[in-house]
């Protein structure tokens, strides 16, 4: 089956690139032909400011404001682009139309993973695109591990009305967080399955193959942070002192260095003695590589994506509160891996069943 994937931009985003890589790898293993459609959109700053001002006036709220999209095509770290070109089959699309289905001979579309259903991350027509508003009724439509980014409802009434109609056209919907199951039911009137982020459908060995050529590093505390701040570094310093190990830091987004690579990022988890992170995918890869970790929550919210997975795996004690480290104890990885294997089987089953069914069954 030829499957078109819609997800967030590759950008300077380790997690965004890797979740798409993982989903394609899984679909390939299941015998399908995946193709990711990358948005080629560039908003002027003026247009973004006007859209933001309009939303503030309309909602009289500062919640859920659109994030300025600092991208245009494949602008970004050259090493990241090299990884994408080598490992992810993708095409750049400016306008999403029904003609895409015929042009690429697609049998199905899948939306996900990552925060594909968060309005602030999908300006203008992109939110409708993420609900496949351009796809006709003949093609199969699924979401896999779609995320709203938080448990609060951020849609305007107009967005909710439009997207709920589109969501009802899907053959099957799956989401990444438990709260998203409720949001789908309460606001879209649709049932959704809870599944794992696609990165968790691959195992440690799959990622080790990618970083095989990276030399082994000395033992260290690995800090991977969306924004390296005092809270993250305070925790890392305490653990560094307790374990007498150096700290290695990598940042996401605009702080990615030109020499950084996806392969080296995998190797940091492979070789780390301990991980401190405020990132969802930082937490995920600590689990995949069975590394003890501490997660520093974002005080501004959006933490449900962490809590949903940690609670499923019995790892809630890894959350840092008020910079107090509650547990440096080793994790019972045998128990965690057993739980993960059950969840992995259920998530794989969602893809197997729904892509094997005929559209409309």
Across the structure, where does each feature detected by a protein language model lie?
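Active-site anion-handling motifs in enzyme catalytic cores
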Residues: 1-361
């Amino acid at each position: 089956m030829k499957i078109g994937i819609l997800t967030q931009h590759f950008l300077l985003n380790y997690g965004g690139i890797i979740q798409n890589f993982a989903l394609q790898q899984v679909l390939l293993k299941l015998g399908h032909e995946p193709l990711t459609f990358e948005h080629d959109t560039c908003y002027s700053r003026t247009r973004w400011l006007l859209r933001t001002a309009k939303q503030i006036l309309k909602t009289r709220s500062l919640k859920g404001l659109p994030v300025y999209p600092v991208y245009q095509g494949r602008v970004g770290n050259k090493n990241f682009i090299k990884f994408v070109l080598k490992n992810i089959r993708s095409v750049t699309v400016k306008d999403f139309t029904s003609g895409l289905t015929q042009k690429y001979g697609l049998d199905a579309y899948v939306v996900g993973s990552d925060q594909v259903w968060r309005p602030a991350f999908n300006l203008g027509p992109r939110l409708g695109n993420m609900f496949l508003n351009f796809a006709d009724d003949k093609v199969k439509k699924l979401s896999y591990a779609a995320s709203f980014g938080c448990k609060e409802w951020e849609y305007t009434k107009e967005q909710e009305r439009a997207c709920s109609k589109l969501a009802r056209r899907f053959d099957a919907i799956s989401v990444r967080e438990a709260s998203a199951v409720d949001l789908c039911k309460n606001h879209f009137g649709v049932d959704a399955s809870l599944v794992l982020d696609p990165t968790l459908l691959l195992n440690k060995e799959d990622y080790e193959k990618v970083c095989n050529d990276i030399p082994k590093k000395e033992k260290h505390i690995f800090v991977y942070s969306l924004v390296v701040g005092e809270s993250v570094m305070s925790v890392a310093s305490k653990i560094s002192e307790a374990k007498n190990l150096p700290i290695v830091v990598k940042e996401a987004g605009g702080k990615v260095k030109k020499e950084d690579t996806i392969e080296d990022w995998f190797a940091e988890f492979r070789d780390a003695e301990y991980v401190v992170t405020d990132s969802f995918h930082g937490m995920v890869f600590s689990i995949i590589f069975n590394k003890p970790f501490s997660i520093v929550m974002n005080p501004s919210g959006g933490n449900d994506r962490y809590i949903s997975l940690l609670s499923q795996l019995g790892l809630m004690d890894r959350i840092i509160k008020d910079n107090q480290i509650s547990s440096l104890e080793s994790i019972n990885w045998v128990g965690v891996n057993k739980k993960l294997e059950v969840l992995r089987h259920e998530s794989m089953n969602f893809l197997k069943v729904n892509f094997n069914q005929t559209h409309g069954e």
